[in-house]
């Protein structure tokens, strides 16, 4: 049986909020089987829990934000969720003492490191996968995103930026998902932005925590970061990273093919909502063995049952 996963014990880190520029403390704790990912605002009295559900993604400008019915939000969840998805973690409690997840270095890599350092624990319940049975597609002008039936989890992703640096890079990528491929090829790709936009955002009290420490910054002609890029195709890889995180609010690892052209947070969430609303387009399945399972997550070292 392929089992559900959580973290072995609590792990904590401190970072900066991208939009506020303030210090943010993040804790990741083990959670019971079938509880999914639940985020908790510990800076509020009493603390407020927000489950990671597609219908609670109510803000997608520059990030993905969960907002409950009282308007309480937790923003910038996508990089953390990409790490959770990439390592196959089904259940976790995410505590944060601010309205946003810390941006860390702008990628999923610090979260992957945290999760691997504390250890991953298999739980005594079968892992559920969301298998795509019918094509689901949403469009917005020339942008589109689609999920199709497929035996594993495959990504076919294209971006289209006219900036000279991005235009010279590879703007298309195909990959077969596995935890090892995610960690090696995707997790270190950083968010990117343009100097002209950053100046405007700061003038409007946004992106106050943004810097070259947590983003690839471009002027009109070049990358401004002294160390350059981590991957030659870091731009398309970061968009794939974002999509991994955005898709994980479906609540399960996806078995299917994800195809995208110029998509972003809003379109990704529309796709998840459209998928879940069409109940004959998907099914939940479990698998007996790693060989049988179509999506490969690395086996946690020293796994124990809870």
UniProtKB/Swiss-Prot annotation:
The UniProt record lists the keyword Lipid metabolism: yes
Pathway field: Glycolipid biosynthesis; lipid IV(A) biosynthesis; lipid IV(A) from (3R)-3-hydroxytetradecanoyl-[acyl-carrier-protein] and UDP-N-acetyl-alpha-D-glucosamine: step 2/6
SUPFAM superfamilies: Ribosomal protein S5 domain 2-like
Taxonomy, superkingdom: Bacteria
BP term (GO), one: lipid A biosynthetic process
Disulfide bonds: none
GO cellular component: membrane
InterPro entries found in the cross-reference section: Ribosomal_Su5_D2-typ_SF (IPR020568), UDP-acyl_GlcNac_deAcase (IPR004463), UDP-acyl_GlcNac_deAcase_C (IPR011334), UDP-acyl_N-AcGlcN_deAcase_N (IPR015870)
Active site annotation, chain numbering: 265
The EC number(s) this enzyme carries: 3.5.1.108
Keyword annotations: Hydrolase, Lipid A biosynthesis, Lipid biosynthesis, Lipid metabolism, Metal-binding, Zinc
Any one GO molecular function term: UDP-3-O-acyl-N-acetylglucosamine deacetylase activity
Gene3D superfamilies: lpxc deacetylase, domain 1, lpxc deacetylase, domain 2
Keyword Lipid biosynthesis: yes
Positions annotated to bind Zn(2+): 79, 238, 242
UniProt family annotation: Belongs to the LpxC family.
Protein known as: UDP-3-O-acyl-N-acetylglucosamine deacetylase
């Amino acid at each position: 049986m392929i089992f559900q996963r959580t973290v072995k014990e609590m792990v904590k880190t401190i970072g900066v909020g991208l939009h506020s520029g303030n210090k943010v403390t993040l804790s990741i704790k083990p959670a019971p089987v079938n509880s999914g990912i639940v985020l908790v605002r510990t800076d509020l009295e009493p603390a407020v829990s927000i489950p990671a559900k597609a219908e609670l993604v109510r803000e997608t400008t520059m990030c993905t934000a969960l907002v409950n019915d009282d308007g309480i939000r937790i923003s910038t969840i996508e990089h953390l969720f990409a790490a959770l998805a990439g390592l196959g973690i089904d259940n976790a409690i995410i505590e944060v003492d601010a309205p946003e997840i810390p941006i860390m270095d702008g990628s999923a890599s610090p979260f992957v490191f945290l999760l691997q350092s504390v250890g991953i624990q298999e739980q005594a319940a079968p892992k559920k996968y969301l298998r795509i049975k019918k094509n689901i597609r949403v469009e917005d002008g020339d942008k589109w995103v689609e999920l199709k039936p497929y035996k594993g989890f495959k990504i076919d992703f294209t971006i289209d930026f006219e900036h000279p640096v991005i235009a010279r890079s590879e703007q298309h990528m195909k990959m077969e998902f596995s935890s090892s491929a995610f960690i090696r090829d995707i997790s270190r790709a950083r968010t990117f932005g343009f100097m002209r936009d950053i100046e405007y955002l700061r003038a409007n009290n946004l992106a106050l925590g943004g810097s070259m420490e947590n983003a690839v910054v471009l002027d009109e002609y070049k990358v401004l970061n002294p160390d350059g890029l981590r991957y030659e195709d870091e731009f398309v890889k970061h968009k794939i990273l974002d999509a991994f995180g955005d898709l994980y609010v479906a609540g399960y690892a996806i078995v299917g093919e994800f195809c995208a052209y110029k998509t972003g947070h809003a379109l990704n969430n529309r796709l998840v909502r459209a998928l879940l609303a069409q109940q004959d387009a998907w099914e939940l399945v479990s698998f007996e063995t790693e060989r049988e399972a179509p999506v490969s997550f690395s086996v946690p070292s020293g796994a124990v049952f809870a």
